Amino acid sequence: MKQTRSPLYPIFLFVIINLIIFTLSRLGLAIWQADRVSAVAGWGQLFLQGLRMDIVALCYLFGVPALFTVLFHNSRIWKMILRIWLTLGSVFILFMELATPAFIETYDFRPNRLFIEYLIYPKEVFSMLMEGHLTAVIFSLIFTVVAFVCYWKLSGYAVKNLRPMSWKLRPVVALLVIAVAFLGARSSFQHRGVNPAMVAFSSDGLVNSLVLNSGYSVLYAAQQFKDEGSSSEVYGKMDTDEMLRIVKASRGRPESDYISEKIPTLTKNQATYQGKPKNIVIILEESFGAQFVGTLGGKPLSPEFDKLAKEGWLFENLYATGTRSVRGIEATTAGFTPTPARAVVKLNNSQSGFFTIADLLAKQGYNTSFIYGGEKHFDNMASFFYGNGFQTIIDQKDYQNPKFTATWGVSDEDLFDKANETFTQLYNEGKPFFSLVFSSSNHDPFEFPDGKIELYEQPKATRNNSAKYADYAIGHFFNLAKQSNYWKDTVFLVIADHDSRAAGASLVPIKHFHIPALILGDHVAPRRDSRLVSQIDMPTTLLSIAGVSGNYPMIGFDLTQDVNPDRAFMQFDQTQALMKGNHDVVIQTPNSKAKGYVYDKEKDTLTEKEVPEEMKKEALAHALLGSYLYKNRLYKGSEEK
């Protein structure tokens, strides 16, 4: 046969095919989310900037093989390598687009770094997919295998009959290919190449993510992992002294409370309760947002929590720092401010020598433990806890004959039975104790025992029914605890790690950061607290009401005192928000100027508004603080190495 095709024919063919796939996928996603795209008048920008980002992705993916194809298109070895490259690259693109709808359904974003993080735990993720998303998994696998076969055959066809190019011409064409690929991948004549921030055009984070393609989104997120130590600098820079001055000023504490020149946030703290220090238990409820709590205006799914709320100190206006469990752990056990990096539970520099209240309490003679129904290795919890003050971890292998076992571990009832058994034994041995008890039943694929609750809806395995079972288990635990010998000497905090499925047509879906928090104990007076507070205020408050004084670097407020934090920090993927009590909000997105908004809680909307420059500086200072303390290993309870 005649050799009539350009040497770059295989590249052109696969570029066109993948552009079509990108466009059809984006079109389908946009039609699915048409209301949100229309709400920001985004149709034109979505497809124009989307095409731009698709070209960027394809220049990165096919630029190198295009160069080598120009040089070695007559080589049989290179043709085989090219076929593999074209096939695997295209299968990756297709697979990521197929995975996108399910990811958006759960996280309200295209696949991002969470997609990568879950790959570290294949057992748990595979079990979850098999139980709750089997049809989608089978379809995706079949489609991917068929696509692989088709792409492989197509690549074989594409590399045939390539017209030889003279060696004199090859260097010239190679330079042209390099120039086109470089300019296409950079897609900008500015000093910085294109990135997701440059093509974001709306106040809706999901719509902004639709501009990207999912393969690019995931690989860009992977590339960002290496910069986690200084991650917050994507919001801007500030002199360290000014950052610390602003943070300290926002706390309203005298300079004499700060006791270290080396550790800038280390303070001495006197507990409000002056009796014998109490045992402390934190019950961290998986995905139990305010939307599931009747007494906070949510669905009628929490009769047990609502009853308990009348007996303790209920925080009506508390906001989580993030949307992942590790972010909730970071806030409730370490009082650490959120950053755009992964939570410190997963970061290298915080696996030992990083402050937690477990470390503080262990040094004061407490037995410290983490009690979980799943496997302790998940989300790197075991490493973080063992390295930072938790002496004992009880996980799934430690349950003998559990009543019910699901994808993510034993049921919440089994968890609380084990917790009650553990606390009773420790109390009988005369050991003061601190424990973090982390539930898991309220998690996709929403498995829990039959016959425990009256189902809220059909079918059984839904988010609402699972939340109602989680509430039932809370009631089960406190029925046991109130009859125990340790009840009168223990303070309990029931708090959610985050809400379930944080989604909304705004850069930060503030409604889905609202979570319940309730402090209970024999000496805790019932009250409803309407102050705007953050998850990071809970460990400081808990220590104070339990009678534990000490030195620590946490910047949260002690809410037993006459103070009003009047602020909440919220991290939504790479976007951070600071909200004040008057509902003024500053939102910071990577490589962009901070913007002011006002939040309408009734309508759940954010509207642009000019806010004081001081508030923007306060937002930036707090956003930078966490990265600064982490990077320089300055989040400690003392100056000891």
Where are these regions (language model features)?
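Transmembrane and membrane-interface helices of multi-pass
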Residues: 2-231
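Exposed alpha-helical structural elements
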Residues: 7, 42, 124, 136, ...
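Alpha-helix initiation and N-capping motif
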Residues: 21, 112, 122-123, 212-215, ...
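Residues that form generic nucleotide/phosphate-binding pockets
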Residues: 50, 54, 128, 153, ...
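A broad, low-specificity signal for short, low-complexity segments enriched in glycine/proline
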Residues: 75-78, 86-89, 167-169, 177-182, ...
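Short coil/turn linker and secondary-structure boundary residues
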Residues: 116, 120-121, 213, 230-238, ...
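The feature marks either
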Residues: 204, 211-216, 220-268, 276, ...
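Solvent-exposed soluble domains appended to multi-pass membrane proteins
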Residues: 250-641
